[in-house]
Structure formats: C-alpha cells, structure tokens
Curated annotation (Swiss-Prot):
Glycosylation sites: 89, 119, 133, 151, 240, 304
Coiled-coil intervals, chain numbering: 130-255
UniProt xrefs under SUPFAM superfamilies: Fibrinogen C-terminal domain-like (SSF56496)
Keyword annotations: Angiogenesis, Calcium, Coiled coil, Developmental protein, Differentiation, Disulfide bond, Glycoprotein, Metal-binding, Secreted, Signal
Biological role stated in the UniProt entry: Binds to TEK/TIE2, competing for the ANGPT1 binding site, and modulating ANGPT1 signaling. Can induce tyrosine phosphorylation of TEK/TIE2 in the absence of ANGPT1. In the absence of angiogenic inducers, such as VEGF, ANGPT2-mediated loosening of cell-matrix contacts may induce endothelial cell apoptosis with consequent vascular regression. In concert with VEGF, it may facilitate endothelial cell migration and proliferation, thus serving as a permissive angiogenic signal. Involved in the regulation of lymphangiogenesis.
GO CC, any one term: extracellular space
GO biological process: angiogenesis; blood coagulation; cell differentiation; Tie signaling pathway
Domain notes: The Fibrinogen C-terminal domain mediates interaction with the TEK/TIE2 receptor.
InterPro entries (alphabetical): FIB_ANG-like, Fibrinogen-like_C, Fibrinogen_a/b/g_C_1, Fibrinogen_a/b/g_C_dom, Fibrinogen_CS
The protein, known as: Angiopoietin-2
Length: 496
C-alpha cells in the first residue's frame, strides 16, 4: 500500500515539473514547440507563432522628439489588443494541454495503480501465506516445547518435593544428633573436670606420699645409725664381760626390790576394785545423778545382764552425764578393724576408742537417747551436730543407725545419710555401693554409697590433712577432702 502511494506522488511531481518547465519556456524563449520526457514516453507540444510582435529593429529611440503623438497612441492600442488576443489563445492552448495531460495521466495512473495493487496483493498474499505457515510451524514447535517444559517442570517439582522431605528428615536427624552431641559434650566436660580434680588430688597425694617417704628414709637412716651404735655397744659389752656380771648382780637386787613393790601395789589395787564394784551404772547419766560429777572412766553394765564394759563419762560438757562412744584425737589407735572388734569395742576409754556397737544398741533401745557429735579442725575451730533421737538396731539388722531432729553448727544437713544405713567394716560390706566403701575409705561406719561422712577414717596429721578422701570427714562442715583433727561421739538420755 505504501508503495502505491509513493508511486502516485512520484507521478504527480513529474507532471508538475513538466508543466512548470513548459510555462517557463514560453515566458522566456517564445519557441514554437516544447518537448516533455516522462519515462519511456515523450510529449511534444506545437504552439502558434506571434506575428504581430514588434521586432527589436522597430524600436525607437527613447530620447527622440515626439512630433506625432496621436498617431502613435492608436497604433499602441491596436498592438495591445493583438497581444491580448495572442495571450488568450496561448491560455486556451495551455488549458487544453493541461486537460489533455490530466486525462492521459489519470488513465495511466489508474492502470499503474491497478497493476501495482494486483502485484502487491499477490505478493502480500504470498507473504501472508508464508507467514501463516511459519506461524503455524512456530506454534506447533512452541506447543511441543511447552509440553516438554511442563513435563520437565512436573518432574522437577516432584524431585524438589522429595528433596524437601529428605531435607526436613535430615534436619530433624541433625537437630537430634546435635542435641545428643551437646549432652555428650556436657557429660564429657563434667567428666574432664572430675578427672582434672582427681589428677590434682592425686598429685597432692603423691606429693604427700613422697614427703612421707622422705621422712621414712630419714627415720631409717637414723635407725641405722642407732643400730650401728647398738652394735658398737654390744661389742663393747661382750668385751667387758666382767662389767656385765657386776651389772647383772645389781639388776637382780633391783628386781627383788621391784617384786616387793609390786606385791604392795596389788593389795592396794584389790581394795580399789572392790570399791568400784560397789558403784556400777547403766550409763554415765546414772553415775552423774548418783553424785559422781568428775569426768573419767567408769564401769557400765549391759541392760538386763551382768556383763560389764569400761566407758569414759564426760561430766562437764552441756551439763554432764554424757557416755562417750567414740573418740579420735591423735591417731594412736587403728580404726580399720573387723566386725567383731567394732561389736565389742576397742581402744582405751581415756584415749582413742570405740565403745562397742552391741552395748550402744542395747542401751539406746531401753529409752530415748540423744546423740552429740563434737568436731575440731586443725585451725582450732569447733562445731557440733546434735540429734534429738538416736538408736541402733540389733546385730540382726547390722546395727542400723536411726536419727531424727538435727541441730547444731556443723551443717544444716546431716552428714550421716538418712534414712538409716547399715554398719559396714572391712570384713562385712553392708553399704549401698559395689565398691566396698569400708575398704576404700578405711574404718567401720554407716556408709550409704560411701556417703558424706566417716569419723573412723584414716588419721592424717596437720599439713597432710587436705585432699584426703579416706580421712576423718564431715562433708557439710569441711567438705569431702578435709581430714579433721579430733572428734567425739557421746550419748545421753533425752530426759536427762
């Protein structure tokens, strides 16, 4: 369509150019013919001649003297009329020419436009057909691609869903494993801390053992020097046999004098024993009430029996009347004893001793007793725990301890585990631990799973009493690794 419009405009411009050239030629030259070339066509126009036009030779001089003025005026009017006629003829010819050109050009333009339209229409139809075919082919290809993309998208969505489910499952497993790892790390940290503490304590114990070893080596060296000195003295004594004989004679006289003194002291002892037999009590409270208010060793009888035992009576602490059932003060007595020894008692009542589980069990089951435990550390501090009700079961129940109503300054919590635990020794394991606490911590005691206390443990001297888990300990006063200097356990009737 645009090509047709362009072609029509081109033809109009050509015709206009030809007409302008024709008019210019007529105005400037006055020729009889005019030729127009348009494409393969050539147009020639014949024009009439202007015979009445004045020639240049007939021109007159402008400065001539005008003598016959009227004659010249008529001639000029006539010539003007001729020129006007000529102009009218030329105008008519031009109008005819224009009409002819327009008629011919219209026909040619119509033919050209029809041919152009037909050609363009065929071309456009062919182009449209090709475009439709290409569009159909592209549409088919796009449909195939869309189907492939849809299938691929569906498959990817399924894979994505599967991956999402797998990812969620893995995330849950990772969270569970992370939680387990954190728990294991906490346990590991706790165990590492315990191991480090044990290593530190082990190092301290090794240092203490090393110091004891050095002391023993010094003692052995001293003993070696003493033995050498004794050997020298023995050699000297062997050589000086005569001197020994004289000394033997002197010794015989001394022995005779000693025998005389012993016989005299035996008679005095018999009289003292007879006096003691007259004052026998079931506990120290009865002795106190009878007027004996001096602390010391007294003879006590088992309830409902004539069997006797020696016990130390504290007649000063807290109003007196206390029967001491245990004392630790210098480490002179070994408390790693058998079941039978703890049952009957051992040691000296005036020093370190254990009164005996059987006697304490029988006495505390006759009436209600209180138990007082007095403690002293190596810095001179003292504390106590007082139980308002205390008794021991019989041997049938392993002398199980029973305590109620704790007061005192040695901790707000009882360091003897409750409810009551059975008594254990190195040859009778009655605790609640598979580790045999009596053998690990030494001494007989009411162990739970070893527990927070043991007043019958190993005695450690000053500067060696820390970080000792088998020492004399009372956890809720000094902790589990501090070994005390002195302890006293004593009982008294609750109604005293």
């Amino acid at each position: 369509m645009w090509q047709l419009v362009f072609f029509a405009l081109s033809c109009d411009l050509v015709l206009a150019a030809a007409y302008n050239n024709f008019r210019k030629s007529m105005d400037s030259t006055g020729k009889r013919q005019y030729q127009v070339q348009h494409g393969p066509c050539s147009y020639t126009f014949l024009l009439p001649e202007t015979d009445n036009c004045r020639s240049p030779s007939s021109s007159y001089v402008s400065n001539a003297v005008q003598r016959d003025a009227p004659l010249d005026y008529d001639d000029s009017v006539r010539r003007l009329q001729v020129l006007e006629n000529i102009m009218e003829n030329n105008t008519q010819w031009l109008m005819k020419l224009e009409s002819y050109i327009q008629d011919n050009m219209k026909k040619e333009m119509v033919e050209i436009q029809q041919n152009a339209v037909q050609n363009q229409t065929a071309v456009m139809i062919e182009i449209g057909t090709n475009l439709l075919n290409q569009t159909a082919e592209q549409t088919r290809k796009l449909t195939d691609v869309e189907a492939q993309v849809l299938n691929q998208t569906t498959r990817l969505e399924l894979q994505l869903l599967e991956h999402s489910l797998s990812t969620n499952k893995l995330e849950k497993q990772i969270l569970d494993q992370t939680s387990e790892i954190n728990k294991l790390q906490d346990k590991n940290s706790f165990l590492e801390k315990k191991v480090l503490d044990m290593e530190d304590k082990h190092i301290v114990q090794l240092q203490s053992i090393k110091e004891e070893k050095d002391q023993l080596q010094v003692l052995v060296s001293k003993q070696n020097s003493i033995i050498e000195e004794l050997e020298k003295q023995l050699v000297t004594a062997t050589v000086n046999n005569s001197v020994l004989q004289k000394q033997q004679h002197d010794l015989m006289e001394t022995v005779h004098n000693l025998l005389t003194m012993i016989s005299t002291s035996n008679s005095a002892k018999h009289s003292l024993v007879a006096k003691e037999e007259q004052i026998i009590f079931r506990d120290c409270a009865e002795a106190f009430k009878s007027g004996l208010t001096t602390s010391g060793t007294y003879t006590l009888t088992f309830p409902n029996s004539t069997e006797e035992t020696k016990a130390y009576c504290d007649m000063e602490t807290g109003g007196g009347g206390w029967t001491v059932i245990q004392r630790r003060e210098d480490g002179s007595v070994d408390f790693q004893r058998t079941w039978k020894e703890y049952k009957m008692g051992f040691g000296s009542p005036s020093g370190e001793h254990w009164l005996g589980n059987e006697f304490v069990s029988q006495v505390t089951n006759q009436k209600r007793y209180v138990l007082k435990i007095h403690l002293r550390d190596w810095e001179g501090n003292e504390a106590y725990s007082l139980y308002e009700h205390f008794y021991l079961s019989s041997e049938e129940f392993n002398y199980r301890i029973h305590l109620k109503g704790l007061t005192g300054t040695a901790g707000k919590i009882s360091s003897i585990s409750q409810p009551g635990n059975d008594f254990s020794t190195k040859d009778a394991d009655n605790d609640k631990c598979i580790c045999k606490c009596s053998q690990m911590l030494t001494g007989g005691w009411w162990f739970d799973a070893c527990g927070p206390s043991n007043l019958n443990g190993m005695y450690y001297p000053q500067r060696q009493n820390t970080n000792k888990f088998n020492g004399i300990k009372w956890y809720y006063w000094k902790g589990s690794g501090y070994s005390l200097k002195a302890t006293t356990m004593m009982i008294r009737p609750a109604d005293f």
